[in-house]
């Protein structure tokens, strides 16, 4: 089971800088009644994040009602790519609300048409059909459904296999967790699909062999033949560690998929819309998938997701056979269009690339200083993961990672709870609007948190 942060107010050092302000004990004593209500009325699973009661957020900063201000390195779990509450998104939402159309199911509306066309134009060929959804889990399950249906039509009842990767995360619904690669999240599933096959992810840290031959050998050892595979799905970078695969591996994978009429699916839910310094993360690999799943940063705010893909695949189902209750909700669509336009046309992709270089340089210095407990640093653009390990080895150290996040929170630097293998990865993902000065200040604060956590754990 994951760990909950302590909700008992603790006196901490005051902070007052351009980007951070801590003026109360943490959490703020006045916020405790709200925290207690949430813990009383919500499931325990909702207690896993640092106990700040958000009041408002702007740009790359988050505020409570009690005078505290955090530099946000979470983006609300990689959602607010365009920044928190930018005026363009707020105005788009207000305009749509005032227009008076709040929901219309799958009946046509102009707003949905504009967003679908815009996404179709910015996506590379042949990804020209757009199916709007609500959540990332919905998108990944839809992509697998399309891949299997395509496989059945192309190769008959035996071509239904789905290949995914160990350590991968594709959502929390049944199908999404079956294709996911985290065993602890599957313990409740008593009848795992025997036609879902997993292979090691070539991150170069926990999987040393990053050759595509290892992929082929793993499938062969499992008795999986290419003719029985309908699709391969992978995160563009593994969310649990911000880990990318080697370019040559992905290019070989794409070639193998083409040769065997297998759909290649990129889960871009964390990677798309500028996060990695490219519009779509798969651009780093020089390939184009058959389907991609989008979410999170597509709207920088409201719930929107999408599957974007080849027309022949997207059109497999006939009228009314593949729909969703809230597909293309007009308010969410308005937010998404404003978000994507701001990212694409407002220089945020370029900023992510430039600021990412500064971020990774600073993190490399921290990793070098703490080489005994930082097993690896992964990332590109404005996403990074510090893989914390038990001193001198590769075993993940979830305790020190948790301590680092907690200490950073007390210093006015907001990260979400550790993720990845053994809960050992401190993940960093600020809004793409962040500035050089804010990054440098955040790196310094994170360095202090790691210094303190390292000293405390060494003394135990």
Where are these regions (language model features)?
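Conserved N-terminal phosphate-binding loop of PLP-dependent enzymes in the Aspartate aminotransferase
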Residues: 2-460
